[in-house]
């Protein structure tokens, strides 16, 4: 009986060590992928900012869910507050916040890549990767039409 208990204990210990090892390798690979710097080609967007383009951009922001994360005024908001697991804060897209140009905007929306070339952890870029240049330009025109707004927001962080 003692031998059986010892074998079960060693088996469980082995499983725990293997699980910790697999999780450690997965975490390490994820962090390495998120630290990768991407270089993207610039895209020439026709951003006229005329009322029709801005209205199209407003429509896209509402129907594609931009307002769900960035807020109705696009000034950012806390999207997920999971305590010790982490907190996700959507960026302020108005001139008071991100203040990005059309290329940085396109890189973020379609590719999920920030100004520094690193992945934006929670940007659902796969949802927008197929968006046409005209739609990205309209969305950018809408963002640029929003008045500057700011609010105190915590930093995004991901726990263990």
What are these regions (language model features)?
Residues 92-123:
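Long, hydrophobic/aromatic-enriched structural stretches that serve as scaffold segments
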Residues 77, 88-95:
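N-terminal post-signal-peptidase region of extra-cytosolic proteins
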Residues 32-45, 71-86, 114-160:
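Flexible coil segments in periplasmic/lumen-exposed cytochrome c-class electron-transfer proteins
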Residues 2-37:
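N-terminal type II signal-anchor transmembrane helix
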Residues 52, 56, 92, 104, ...:
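Extracytoplasmic/secreted proteins, especially bacterial periplasmic and envelope-associated proteins
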Residues 37-62:
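Electrostatic cytochrome c docking/interface patches
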Residues 57, 63-72, 105, 139:
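The canonical Cys-X-X-Cys-His
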Residues 62, 89, 119:
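Residues that flank catalytic or metal-binding motifs in active/ligand-binding sites
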